[in-house]
């Protein structure tokens, strides 16, 4: 196990983090390049996405918190300042979905998923450094989501809105998704950053939001017959429940456990542990004899998407 730990640390530092520092840093326009293709070619004119930049912010902040290397602090600060200066909507709140290579707003919609990742990144930077500005930004984004994207009538979080927080026709995260106003994926990546923010900002209002999100997972998103998590819903939480996503199942089983641990409530932890064991067992249905995990099961027609996508593995 110790050898595995050292091997993984070596891959993290010398193959992953080092690559992003030396290959993807945009020295001309700031931040990081928006695209490197499959042939390892940088595309300097590519747009820059909020999710990618927020994930960079989280990754280098977490790396610095654990490993304390100054180059990770520099990369984290670079990402923090770029997201702050170019993605934050200083007029309406929230963050833009994308900017052009120069840092000008491109797609200004408010995708709740992306705002969640920004909270994740800024809260991790605050956790790693004690930086008050990063914490203040994370708190402000939390309030933006709660004010504009939380549906108090039906419960849950709206998938996307316009820049001014008005209804938007196309709420999809990507072209392959159903156009539902509620998705499991977005709720997963709201409970994740809320949990991280709670580590550095323990307030009753945030705790209430997190507990409600746990209830949404157990009462709305969890299929009590299969113990898979269903993916797409409308405002009234009606959905087809026709897709089983093994990667999301195993991801959720870990993240929900992490949330329960951070809350520190033994009763909640006991309840969550019983459920996530069943979710993890359901995810095992996607495993194949070579140890890989296929992507999805479409219950309509009983077909499998046999792709082995990296994040699922």
Q: Can you name each region flagged by the protein language model?
A:
Residues 1-313:
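Glycan-recognition and catalytic cores of secretory/periplasmic carbohydrate-active enzymes
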């Amino acid at each position: 196990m110790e050898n595995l730990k050292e091997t993984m640390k070596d891959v993290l530092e010398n193959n992953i983090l080092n690559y992003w520092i030396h290959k993807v840093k945009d020295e001309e326009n700031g931040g990081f390049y928006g695209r490197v293709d499959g042939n390892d070619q940088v595309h300097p004119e590519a747009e820059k996405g909020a999710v990618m930049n927020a994930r960079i912010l989280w990754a280098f902040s977490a790396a610095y918190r654990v490993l304390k290397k100054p180059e990770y602090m520099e990369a984290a600060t670079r990402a923090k300042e770029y997201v702050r200066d170019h993605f934050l909507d200083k007029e309406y709140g929230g963050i833009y979905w994308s900017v052009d290579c120069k840092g000008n707003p491109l797609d200004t919609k408010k995708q709740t998923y992306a705002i969640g990742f920004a909270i994740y990144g800024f809260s991790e930077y605050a956790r790693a450094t004690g930086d008050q500005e990063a914490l203040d930004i994370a708190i402000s984004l939390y309030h933006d989501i709660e004010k504009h994207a939380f549906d108090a009538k039906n419960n849950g979080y709206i998938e996307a809105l316009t820049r001014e927080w008005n209804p938007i026709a196309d709420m999809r995260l990507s072209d392959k998704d159903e156009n539902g106003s509620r998705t499991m994926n977005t709720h997963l990546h709201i409970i994740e950053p809320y949990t991280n923010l709670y580590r550095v900002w323990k307030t009753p209002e945030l705790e209430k939001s997190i507990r409600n999100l746990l209830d949404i997972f157990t009462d709305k998103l969890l299929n009590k017959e299969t113990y898979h998590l269903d993916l797409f819903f409308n405002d009234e939480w009606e959905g087809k429940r026709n897709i089983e996503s093994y990667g999301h199942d195993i991801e959720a089983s870990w993240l929900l456990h992490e949330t329960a641990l951070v809350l520190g409530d033994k009763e909640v932890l006991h309840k969550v542990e019983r459920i996530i064991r069943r979710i993890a067992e359901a995810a095992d249905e996607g495993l194949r004899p070579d140890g890989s995990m296929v992507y999805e099961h479409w219950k309509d027609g009983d077909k499998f998407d046999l792709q082995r996508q990296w994040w699922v593995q």
